[in-house]
């Protein structure tokens, strides 16, 4: 699964829906993709965000950086969709690449970027 910023924030607030999804992912050895741009939106005080810190330390959690290749893909996706949210576009790019569903609290923006994404709304 690929997480956007919303579920990362919800995890930090101990949202049961997000906790359960992550527990299931762990039980089934499913990778958890965290786009770096989504992490940047969610992280504010790493020393106080213990739940988020634990997620990031899990062996199956992968933080995907916004490198040159992804930045180019993000720019193309934003141009094609007529939208402007870099983090959402990066989430879409990461989910496409990993062929995973996206866990989100804001499905409308992601659907505008890519209507083919498999979204799980929390």
Model-derived segments and their meaning:
Residues 47, 105-109:
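Short, polar loop motifs at secondary-structure junctions
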Residues 108-116:
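Short loop/helix-cap segments at secondary-structure boundaries that form the rim of catalytic
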Residues 60-81:
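Acidic catalytic patch
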